[in-house]
């Protein structure tokens, strides 16, 4: 898929999405043990931390999903004398730069997230300077149909972003909720949201001032 192509094809199951996210993460955080054996990949998929939702996949489920992903050039099996290992090919298949690959991996593992959450959770994976850098890369992914921008809903303070490579029915639900939320905003007032934004801006300014004084 080139930079100008979109993700009209190649939707993946929740198991396949979890596998891709786990491979991307372990490539960045555990290069000494990457590519992963099937057993190591199952453990990575079923981690109880940094996973939303937590899953309980079997070796059979992961193995079957890996073969399906391999047929779409999203994973590759490396045969070894001691053990076979699997690697991700998402960056090559979708022609992603490293920053985009990490963001896709985070969204594969944890679903919709705010810019600040992506910045915090990527600190061991990629060196983003700020949320503006993340937003720039997300906008490029959105333009190619690989990610979605989700306006904040009631009770939320920030917009969220998620990948667009999952089950089409789930994506349709997200888009429908997004459209409904947008309609509600255009017909109603945003006084409370504007006040929250003003308070957040004031807090950010105070934090920046405090950092200057401490420096």
Swiss-Prot record:
Top-level lineage group: Bacteria
Q: Tell me any Pfam family this protein matches.
A: DUF480
Q: Which InterPro entries match?
A: DUF480 (IPR007432), WH-like_DNA-bd_sf (IPR036388), WH_DNA-bd_sf (IPR036390)
Q: Which residues form the signal peptide?
A: none
What family does the Swiss-Prot or TrEMBL record give for this protein? Belongs to the UPF0502 family.
Q: State the HAMAP family in the record.
A: UPF0502 (MF_01584)
Matches recorded under PANTHER family: UPF0502 PROTEIN YCEH (PTHR38768:SF1)
The molecule here is called UPF0502 protein PputW619_3184
Lineage here is:
Bacteria, Pseudomonadati, Pseudomonadota, Gammaproteobacteria, Pseudomonadales
